[in-house]
A protein has these predicted regions:
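Class I (Rossmann-like) S-adenosyl-L-methionine-dependent methyltransferase catalytic domain
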Residues: 1-39, 43-97, 111-125, 131-196
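A conserved beta-strand element that flanks and buttresses the S-adenosyl-L-methionine
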Residues: 103
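Hydrophobic adenine-recognition pocket in adenosine-nucleotide-binding enzymes
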Residues: 107
Length: 196
């Protein structure tokens, strides 16, 4: 896939992708995070943006070519020191955290329903208390993917201990945010008058 180009999905240049990243980041309930985990990081386009809001990011992908591009991108941005890049898959044992942010962006639909559910049950227990889980996925069916984005999000929403915090959905993408804490809104956390 990466033989002809280092950005086969045009993650760095396509407005659809840039807009999706902006919405994803805007939905995060905390200004900063200590340690994020991003499986399926690809060329590091979202990783670079996460590194600006996180003290540390651990990002993994199965493609060596994608990881090389992510490495160069993060070096160019001066962010490589706070990002750990590893070759791994979403369904492998996750690297040690603990993580207070889990980013599932365009990766969950690669797994079968049962496998995705088992991975999330196994690994989400190790997230820090009050951790955020954000998921962003293409909604249209793709022949090679076992799940659509909507189907993947239905599995994620059933993960024990996750509480929904917010959602953005249009005809192309679904982005949802969960936490494993009390489910308080941003306004409630900041004690905005009238917030519940």
């Amino acid at each position: 896939m990466y033989a002809g180009t280092d950005d086969p999905w045009q993650l760095s240049t396509r407005w659809y992708e840039q807009r999706k990243y902006a919405i994803t980041l805007a939905l995060l309930p905390h200004r900063r995070y200590r340690h994020a985990f991003e499986p399926g990081c690809s060329i590091g386009a979202l990783t670079e943006l996460l590194a600006q809001r996180c003290d540390q990011v651990t990002a993994v992908d199965v493609a060596d070519a994608a990881l090389r591009t992510a490495d160069a991108r993060l070096r160019d941005a001066g962010l490589r020191g706070q990002v750990t890049l590893e070759r791994s898959s979403l369904d492998d044992a996750w690297p040690p955290g603990p993580f207070d942010l889990l980013v599932l962006s365009e990766v969950a639909y690669y797994l079968e329903t049962g496998t995705l559910a088992a991975v999330l049950r196994r690994e989400c227990r190790g997230l820090r208390p009050g951790a955020t889980v954000v998921a962003a996925h293409w909604r249209h069916a793709v022949a090679d993917y076992p799940l659509t984005g909507d189907e993947a999000h239905a599995v994620i929403a059933q993960t024990p201990g996750l509480t929904p915090l917010g959602c953005y959905r249009d005809s192309d993408v679904v982005i949802e945010v969960f936490d494993n804490g009390d489910g308080q809104s941003v306004a409630a956390r900041e004690e905005v008058p009238g917030a519940c």
